[in-house]
């Protein structure tokens, strides 16, 4: 067997395999014998069709089958010998038989070879969130809202109120467009951005007042859009008093002490924002390394990440897009993000390879024991058995390897903490 590897691009190769008659004839004979057992031709008993007739009728199909099987067999052997890192399945481009040899041509994508830039001089900022008493109370108020009551107030609307109003669109001359009138629209000001023109206009407005809103064009060629809004009612959320009885109802009797509940809310906030801080830091690190190492990406790898992003989007619609939805534009918009995912995978693999990182069974056990410490209701032995199972082990190896990769990076770069307040509207 002879073979020649040709580099087509940074991520593509073509492989030519030349096999002698001694190497491919046994497979041809097997295919002929298999066909002989199954083929049925009028005038011949099953299993007794002459070989010459089988070759005449099924020659091209037999040759194609032999080429595919031998291509698969020898590609695996060559990939191992030549340390090829395939990023896609090898495609059979062409094959040709003659009396003496079989020539097979395959194409496939590979993981690109590249040198990772030294990242030890990089600096990053890590947000350090401090949970205040006010933050805890705001979170409790969010929980209490589910049991609160919207009441009408004869006051100017605040930025947290709900304004009920009729709005009508105006034409360029300021005249009402009757067919574009909406009655009893609810403006939940609390959830509108600070720079939203409706929020700006309605904050401070009272019932029976009229305000005008102008929405300036975002792009050249677009026209200004104007509305007249007639305020009918201002409603404000009235929160109930947090009593022991209400606490039991809200928490399904998990807590019977307001102090314990408050402490739990604080702990949940601290854990959430600690996780957010870590995730934001890791995203900054990956973005910087991708920017400094714009590695070429195999299209099959990018396709895989694109499909993953599409599936995530489908889940937001309950598992499937609406009937008739064309995801072409969505895929196009997600493609750059999929490329970055692929680039980060290649960079991560390079860091793991350079530092000889691997995940052992002991690593998985240690991870399980650490997780069990966070949740006393779960026994470490049970977690170990779960994580070591066939269903979970690959996932755990991937998770722990990622931690090790980030550990290598974080130990090499400079990370400076920066105190930061928790966002005002924290809807976790």
UniProtKB/Swiss-Prot annotation:
Keywords: Cell cycle, Cell division, Chaperone, Cytoplasm, Isomerase, Rotamase. Gene3D superfamilies: 3.10.50.40, Trigger factor ribosome-binding domain (3.30.70.1050), Trigger factor, C-terminal domain (1.10.3120.10). Involved in protein export. Acts as a chaperone by maintaining the newly synthesized protein in an open conformation. Functions as a peptidyl-prolyl cis-trans isomerase. Signal peptide: none annotated. The gene is tig. It catalyses: [protein]-peptidylproline (omega=180) = [protein]-peptidylproline (omega=0). Belongs to the FKBP-type PPIase family. Tig subfamily. The keyword Nucleus does not apply. Its main location: cytoplasm. Its EC number is 5.2.1.8. The lineage of its organism: Bacteria, Pseudomonadati, Chlorobiota, Chlorobiia, Chlorobiales. Residues 165-240 form the PPIase FKBP-type domain. Pfam families: Trigger_C (PF05698), Trigger_N (PF05697). One of its GO terms (molecular function) is peptidyl-prolyl cis-trans isomerase activity. It comes from the Bacteria. GO terms for biological process: cell division; protein folding; protein transport. This is Trigger factor. Consists of 3 domains; the N-terminus binds the ribosome, the middle domain has PPIase activity, while the C-terminus has intrinsic chaperone activity on its own. One of its GO terms (cellular component) is cytoplasm.
């Amino acid at each position: 067997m002879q073979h020649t590897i040709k580099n087509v691009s940074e991520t593509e190769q073509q492989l030519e395999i030349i096999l002698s008659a001694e190497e491919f004839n046994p497979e041809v004979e097997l295919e002929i014998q298999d066909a002989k057992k199954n083929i049925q031709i009028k005038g011949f008993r099953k299993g007794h069709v002459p070989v010459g007739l089988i070759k005449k009728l099924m020659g091209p199909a037999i040759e194609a089958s032999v080429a595919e099987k031998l291509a698969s067999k020898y590609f695996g052997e060559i990939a191992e010998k030549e340390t090829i890192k395939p990023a896609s399945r090898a495609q059979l481009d062409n094959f040709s038989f003659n009396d003496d040899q079989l020539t097979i041509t395959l194409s496939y994508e590979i993981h690109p070879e590249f040198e990772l830039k030294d990242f030890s001089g990089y600096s990053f900022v890590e947000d350090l969130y401090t949970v205040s008493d006010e933050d805890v109370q705001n979170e409790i108020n969010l929980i209490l809202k589910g049991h609160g009551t919207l009441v009408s107030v004869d006051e100017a609307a605040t930025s947290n109120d709900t304004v009920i109003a009729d709005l009508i669109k105006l034409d360029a001359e300021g005249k009402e467009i009757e067919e574009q009138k909406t009655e009893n629209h609810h403006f939940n000001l609390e959830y509108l951005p600070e720079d939203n023109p409706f929020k700006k206009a309605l904050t401070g407005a009272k019932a029976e007042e009229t305000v005008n809103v102008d929405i300036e064009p975002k792009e050249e060629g677009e026209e200004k859009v104007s509305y007249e809004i007639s305020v009918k009612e201002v409603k404000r959320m009235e929160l109930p008093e947090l009593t022991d009885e209400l606490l039991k109802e809200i928490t399904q009797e998990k807590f019977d002490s307001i102090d314990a509940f408050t402490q739990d809310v604080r702990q949940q906030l601290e854990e959430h924002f600690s996780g957010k801080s870590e995730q934001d830091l890791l995203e900054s690190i990956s973005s910087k390394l991708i920017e400094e190492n714009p590695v070429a990406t195999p299209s099959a790898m990018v396709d895989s990440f694109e499909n993953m992003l599409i599936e995530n989007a489908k889940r937001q619609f309950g598992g499937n897009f609406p009937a008739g939805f064309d995801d072409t534009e969505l895929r196009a918009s997600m493609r750059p993000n999929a490329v970055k995912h692929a680039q980060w995978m290649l960079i991560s693999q390079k860091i793991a390879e350079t530092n000889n990182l691997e995940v052992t069974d002991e690593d998985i056990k240690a991870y399980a024991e650490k997780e069990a410490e966070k949740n006393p209701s779960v026994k470490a032995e049970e977690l170990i058995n779960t994580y070591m199972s066939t269903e979970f082990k690959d996932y755990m190896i991937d998770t722990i390897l990622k931690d090790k990769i980030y550990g290598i990076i974080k130990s090499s770069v400079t990370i400076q903490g920066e105190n930061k307040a928790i966002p005002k509207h924290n809807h976790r």
